[in-house]
A protein has these predicted regions:
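Extracellular/lumenal glycan-associated context and N-glycosylation machinery
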Residues: 1-71
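Exposed, interaction-prone extracellular/peripheral surfaces
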Residues: 1-15, 19, 166, 176, ...
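An amphipathic, basic-hydrophobic helix/alpha-beta surface used to engage anionic
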Residues: 42-44, 52-302, 344-348, 362
Length: 440
């Protein structure tokens, strides 16, 4: 086994000969051949010396057995798209002998920048060295960092051997989160430590909270007045929830968005969802992310036990890898909203057809309050500039139908600011129609 390892090390050493080492070896062999043909002893000595240098370097580097350990630390572990993060590397010499020249190279995806390289001249026994580099990505996602590669080289630069560690890390680049102003929203009610006036969309004169009947509910809790009004069994919730609930719906349908890259309508929607969810968590809401694919974060088993920081991290991690779906409807998101959507619903929606608009209108009765950021995706595709009359009437019709169903609708166009639109949500029912007419 030892002989096999030695032979393997020598083969790796010969493969690691640098251009300088190969040149010296070729020149030395040539000089030896010429010295033999010309019977020149001096030239023979030069040839032997030139050949011996790279061969000795191969033997030395191949038999070098430094005991080193590496570590990596990310600051922060969740970076915001467009902002820098710093990666700290630490190399420990755990042996009793000093190291020679070490070349470090960390493996990073091209989207984060060029591969960082460092040269460490000497690390004393039981010593360590720390280096750091910066990474930056305009695209959200999860990017692997590592493994760290260690190159051993001789002092003359004749031979280099690469050895890789096995550990790697993941840098999560989350969408941009913008600070939103505090506004009073429809559907607010008594939250944790805050006095909210809740709009009971499903209640009658009694101060009760209602929801759809579920199998196993006590029939004595049926609220007959609301049952007659909505045409299906509605039951009272006897307990007052301790924490306000909110659901943020992200429309990921590819057919509902326009544009590509960071300037697309989908990326605007993802950033808007991140900002809204973070804002609601800061205000004490028990917040859940929901997509048209049925993805729910936190999942049904969470039970609301996560604190705001943990929930925010889960949602941002999910948004970091959110992608367009090939679905054509929002139907997979409707069932969770029907069964557990008594709180505030904030939906960031792409382009809708008549069927989707009607179904969203009917879904409004299941929520305590509903706000829709409806994206005019034609402005992302440049259609409004090329043909000003294209699609404008259809978009305004969708806005009108959702409002008639009880939604608070915020029309969104390319370039709009999320904080400004959020501020407009407080008085959207009276101000938004004027904005539409002005932008028509």
């Amino acid at each position: 086994m030892a002989q096999s390892d030695a032979a393997s090390g020598l083969r790796a050493g010969f493969r690691g000969l640098t251009t300088r080492g190969r040149s010296f070896l070729a020149a030395g062999i040539t000089a030896v051949v010429c010295a033999y043909l010309l019977d020149q002893d001096a030239l023979l000595r030069v040839g032997v010396l030139l050949s011996a240098l790279p061969l000795v370097a191969v033997v030395v580097v191949a038999n070098t057995r430094y005991r080193v350990a590496s570590g990596r630390r990310l600051s922060p572990r969740r970076a915001i798209a467009g902002q820098e993060a710093r990666v700290h590397l630490r190399l420990d010499n755990v042996s009793r002998v000093p190291t020679g020249l070490l070349l470090l190279e960390d493996k990073v995806p091209y989207v984060l920048g060029p591969r960082p390289r460092f040269v460490l001249d000497r690390v004393e026994p039981r010593g360590y060295r720390e280096v750091s580099y910066r990474v930056r990505s305009d695209l959200r996602g999860r990017y692997p960092l590592g493994p760290l590669q260690l190159r051993l080289a001789d002092p003359f630069g004749m031979c280099e051997v690469t050895r890789a560690f096995t550990a790697s890390d993941v840098l999560t680049v989350v969408p941009l989160v913008q600070a939103l102003p505090y506004v009073r929203l429809s559907g607010e009610w008594l939250g944790q430590g805050e006095s909210h006036s809740r709009t009971l969309a499903l209640a009658g004169n009694d101060d009760v909270i209602l929801r759809e009947y579920r199998p196993g509910d006590d029939l004595r809790r049926v609220h007959w007045r609301s049952t007659a009004k909505y045409g299906e069994l509605m039951v009272r919730r006897e307990e007052q929830p301790q924490k306000a609930r909110a659901t943020v719906l992200l429309d990921t349908r590819e057919i509902g968005h326009r544009g590509s890259g960071p300037a697309s309508s989908f990326e605007w929607a993802v950033s808007c969802v991140a900002s809204v969810a973070t804002h609601l968590l800061e205000r004490g809401y028990q917040t859940q992310l929901l997509t048209d694919t049925g993805l729910a974060v936190p999942g049904p088993g969470a039970g609301g036990h996560n604190n705001a920081a943990d929930t925010s991290g889960l949602i941002l991690d999910a948004l970091a890898v959110a992608d367009l779906s090939d679905g054509g409807t929002l139907s997979r998101a409707e069932e969770p909203l029907r069964t557990g959507g008594e709180g505030l619903l904030v939906a960031i929606l792409g382009e809708l057809d008549d069927t989707q608009t009607a179904r969203l209108g009917r879904l409004r009765s299941r929520t305590g309050g509903a706000i829709a950021f409806l994206l005019d995706t034609g402005t992302w595709a440049g259609l409004r500039m090329l043909a000003p009359g294209t699609g404008g009437d259809e978009f305004r019709a969708r806005v009108r139908k959702l409002r008639e169903a009880g939604w608070t609708v915020i029309p969104v166009r390319a370039g709009d600011s999320v904080p400004d639109l959020w501020r407009a949500a407080e008085g959207a029912k009276t101000t938004a129609p004027n904005r539409e007419e002005a932008g028509a």
